[in-house]
Amino acid sequence: MVYNITSSNQYQYFAAMWAEPTAMLNQCVSALSQSYQTQAARDTVRQQFSNLLSAIVTPNQRFPEAGYRVYINSAVLKPLYESLMKSFDTRNRIIETEEESRPSASEVANATQRVDDATVAIRSQIQLLLNELSNGHGLMNRAEFEVLLPWATAPAT
């Protein structure tokens, strides 16, 4: 018994693009309360989101029978998740000085504004992702999944 792959674009469903819905929702709620003033803090939360994703289906392993899973590569969630991941990466863009050892007052003010802008962008993307998840976008169960990728059972003998 295997999934009946009829198109090359069906291989995407075997990638590590799946998450437990409750874990993803909880991560969004938790991340909204985090501070993003340092790159280390942004990296930590980005890694927490990344760690939620796993492969749950293989050509020989059927979609879980019970419950729903978040498919982060769905048309609605993919752009939100990608924007969120990009908003975490502000390394080497926060402080741009002519002399790193002695930033001027305007360079410090500019860096502070960039950190604030990054924080606003992160929170905005998390809230958008949370809204779509709460509305049920990007969630699939076995029946919905197997409309896209049929499970072929062995013929009775």
Curated annotation (Swiss-Prot):
Give a GO cellular-component term.
Answer: helical viral capsid
InterPro entries xref list: TMV-like_coat (IPR001337), TMV-like_coat_sf (IPR036417)
Tell me which domain of life the UniProt entry assigns to the organism this sequence originates from.
Viruses
Similarity-based family: Belongs to the virgaviridae capsid protein family.
Which UniProt keywords are listed?
Capsid protein, Helical capsid protein, Virion
**Transmembrane residues, as ranges?**
none
What does this protein do, in the record's words? Capsid protein self-assembles to form rod-shaped virions about 18 nm in diameter with a central canal enclosing the viral genomic RNA.
What GO molecular function terms would the record report? Answer: structural molecule activity
Compartment(s) of residence = Virion
Coiled coil spans: none
Q: Any idea what this protein is called?
A: Capsid protein
